[in-house]
Amino acid sequence: MADAAIHGHEHDRRGFFTRWFMSTNHKDIGVLYLFTGGLVGLISVAFTVYMRMELMAPGVQFMCAEHLESGLVKGFFQSLWPSAVENCTPNGHLWNVMITGHGILMMFFVVIPALFGGFGNYFMPLHIGAPDMAFPRMNNLSYWLYVAGTSLAVASLFAPGGNGQLGSGIGWVLYPPLSTSESGYSTDLAIFAVHLSGASSILGAINMITTFLNMRAPGMTMHKVPLFAWSIFVTAWLILLALPVLAGAITMLLTDRNFGTTFFQPSGGGDPVLYQHILWFFGHPEVYIIVLPAFGIVSHVIATFAKKPIFGYLPMVYAMVAIGVLGFVVWAHHMYTAGLSLTQQSYFMMATMVIAVPTGIKIFSWIATMWGGSIELKTPMLWALGFLFLFTVGGVTGIVLSQASVDRYYHDTYYVVAHFHYVMSLGAVFGIFAGIYFWIGKMSGRQYPEWAGKLHFWMMFVGANLTFFPQHFLGRQGMPRRYIDYPEAFATWNFVSSLGAFLSFASFLFFLGVIFYTLTRGARVTANNYWNEHADTLEWTLTSPPPEHTFEQLPKREDWERAPAH
């Protein structure tokens, strides 16, 4: 530990290329995941804004088939201007490409890489006192597989797809028979992109599990490990068990498309509903793969700024384990309308509602941690509180949707869109921002301006709720999702929702400016622990930024004994 502090500001002798392209250092690879996830997130959020521009008013104003006749570049700029053509023929394929691209990029290439690959790689070894990951070279391979997958996903947007146009327009879930009949190789590229992303995540999961089990500091038992490290450990098991199932499903899809098999084609004895079962067996654990690392971050942020140890450490740990286990036995609640028997529907209803119990343990433990604490509303705490509100709203609407009889009405409406965005998108994204503001001083050695972080939070919080809360009303009115146009009866709430999306996008651009300012001109961090004594995990004993080789001597018990387990 002492050696680590002494060498904290030694000159890094690695060149730029060696450090960022060939690195086996867990901290550098974590930064790369965060940086790449941010870039892909910018693309995906731009798709969102384009879709909300189109949905701002009834009728099709932007996505017109006539723009295709102007060529790619000119047509693109025309599509941003509603009066560019007099008579607009709706370009439904472009709309489907936007939906597919947004879903695939966000699910596989933004949120999981940022939370699991970024924060997990950087801080899990620090929290358990490990010098690095168990398999550093595999860590490097994992990142570059992710980059390769990202490249294929973006390339699929410009490859020949259905209707003689560019891009794959089959939705991120890749449901047959649409995905098996879509022409062009854009869909194949998207499938390969998901394959590479899955391979990257599986390698990362093996690495995380091995590191967690074998490289904890001397004397640090499983029940002494910080909650963020536990969240990464549970997430790694979910990835290891769920992603190979997805890989099997999309491989079968690939052979149906290209090699004449009929796994999912009724004409050859196959069954499209089989694909739904296999996909959602992965798809529901995916929700917790996304949100569990955010749980870990929020636990540390709340404990730090409530200035109290986390309430109920062991229940918090086993609630995460229970959520992970239960996540594998509820998949068919996505399929109530796909012909399940009454008995099957009853089981999946009950199992889905049971997940509310461990989730409730976590919510009330966070509230109990704050109760009676000396709360300091710094920027990371605001994001953590925002996470609590948004995740709770998403959880409550999840209880509504778990009822098969109610889901008959809400299935594939904007009520479902609002529900899963509150849980996954807003919950996970607010967790990411909480982590960035909590740790950016530790990672970069420079601190953000507090006023800017708070302004970013309020812009995003208002924008996010303005975007997605009205979609509950649209769903209750019966507006189906994934449509390019809608009747005039839905115009008001769509207009409000679009305004919220624009505000959220503006907040994201402002955030990029805050990060640029912080990294170039932010106040230098001189203290190892720049928050308070309740930030008591091992990274706060290190310099800011931590040295290249973190623990040249393994931490002793007194270095970590004030961990949240106590």
Swiss-Prot record:
Pathway: Energy metabolism; oxidative phosphorylation
Covalent cross-link site, 1'-histidyl-3'-tyrosine (His-Tyr): 284-288
Membrane-spanning residues: 29-49, 97-117, 141-161, 189-209, 227-247, 278-298, 310-330, 348-368, 381-401, 420-440, 455-475, 499-519
Short name of one Pfam family: COX1
Binding site for Cu cation: 284, 288, 333-334
GO cellular component: plasma membrane; respiratory chain complex IV
Official protein name in the record: Cytochrome c oxidase subunit 1
Organism whose genome encodes this protein: Cereibacter sphaeroides
